Swiss-Prot record:
Keywords per UniProt: Hydrogen ion transport, Ion transport, Membrane, Transport, Vacuole
Entries under Pfam families matching the protein: ATP-synt_F
Identification of the protein by name: V-type proton ATPase subunit F
One Gene Ontology cellular component annotation held by this UniProt entry: vacuolar proton-transporting V-type ATPase, V1 domain
Lineage top rank: taxon: Eukaryota
Origin species: Neosartorya fischeri (strain ATCC 1020 / DSM 3700 / CBS 544.65 / FGSC A1164 / JCM 1740 / NRRL 181 / WB 181)
InterPro entries: ATPase_V1-cplx_f_g_su, ATPase_V1-cplx_fsu_euk, ATPase_V1_fsu_sf
Function: Subunit of the V1 complex of vacuolar(H+)-ATPase (V-ATPase), a multisubunit enzyme composed of a peripheral complex (V1) that hydrolyzes ATP and a membrane integral complex (V0) that translocates protons. V-ATPase is responsible for acidifying and maintaining the pH of intracellular compartments.
Membrane topology: Peripheral membrane protein
Amino acid sequence: MAASAVSYKERQFLAVIGDEDSVTGLLLAGIGHVTDGPDAQRNFLVVDSKTETSAIEKAFQNFTQERKDIAVLLINQHIAERIRHSVDSFADPFPAVLEIPSKDHPYDPEKDSVLKRVRRLFGE
């Protein structure tokens, strides 16, 4: 119990991997944060058609494995599809990974990794 309490107490930020409109909206809502120090890291990644899948994968790994201050990772569902293997295999309780729709790509519950796990749990 104490170990889990320590693991979530430091987690106080949201992170987002998304298209420009989604990230801009969330930044305007106040989730933007840049870490202190010479290696200042942002808690967001703007993805467009020119963004390489490896950059998305690197940001996902950074937000989920390396950074211990992220509590929730929001990722546009169509971007999560590009790194589906990583999203589906991530099973840690923190950060919570939530797939969200974008302006041009509606939400599809059949693709959501969290809903897939819930369905398997209940035998559907």
